[in-house]
Amino acid sequence: MRIVVESDPTLFAAKHLIKRLNDFKPSESKKYFVLGIPSYEGSAQRIFDYLIQEHKKGNVSFKNVATFQLDEFYKIEKTHPFSMCTVMYRNFFKIVDILPENVHILDSKTLDPDAETRNFEARIKEYGGIDFLFCGVGSDGSVARNEPGASLASRTRLKTLAIVTLQKLSSRLKLSVNSVPKVALTMGLGTILDAKEIMVLFLGQEKSMALNRSVESSVNHMCPASVFQLHDRCLFVCDEKATMEMSSKTVRYFNGIGKVAHEILGDKNACDFAKSSNASELKLFHRRMLSRNK
């Protein structure tokens, strides 16, 4: 796990994602870079906006990209204004050059949720798995629609939403609690962990306890985001307010890793340091970290 604390975390996250997209070279055996993506809302909204901005400038293309949406509300029309399908097509997919057949969103009107979720998992496998997944985290540590108590090994499935979630949806959508969707189709935590690389955003003081429990506490189903401790290539992108509940020692430690990585790698992306195969670089990195921690 890596943690970076940025003054503009969404800009950092967007640039990191664009680098991954531009580094991808399609081949006969691997035609598409596969993204797992959240909805166009909250902290992710600015990332999508920046992707659109850079696409219009010609700095990034989505022709060789396939996407899998993290979740979708169940039993609402695809044209409903709250549907992920409507929101994502209106604000992102219709603007960039992604091929429609490479956009995958769970069917909100399916009559057989079990079959739909199995087919969704099968489609991910057909593409060779998710290469890069990014998401935000709820103040309770929820990931997609995996709320506290969710199985850490869960797959894509139908999930009843907690009353706290319904109240937040009610406030955000300006509807009564009785009017908001109460069930959703969602990628499971096990499905999410299968992604080759994961980037998670923690923004604002309201996410500080979730960050603390995700990093400094044990892996626990009551904080779903803590499961990211088990992933070998997971990056947490935070602002300073989100670190308020973490110990200063932990924050200094991860800031130190970032600074040393920048010193050693120069213009290389410091987030790529974990992939470095240069033994001398790794030895130098560890020596510097040990000397700083004395």
Regions found by a protein language model. Give the residues of each.
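A glycine-rich beta-strand to alpha-helix segment
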Residues: 33-43, 47, 123-148, 269-290
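A glycine- and small-aliphatic-rich helix-loop capping segment at beta-alpha/alpha-beta transitions
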Residues: 49-61, 84-90, 148-158, 217
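Ligand-binding beta-strand-loop-alpha-helix segment within the catalytic cores
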Residues: 60-134, 254-269, 273-277
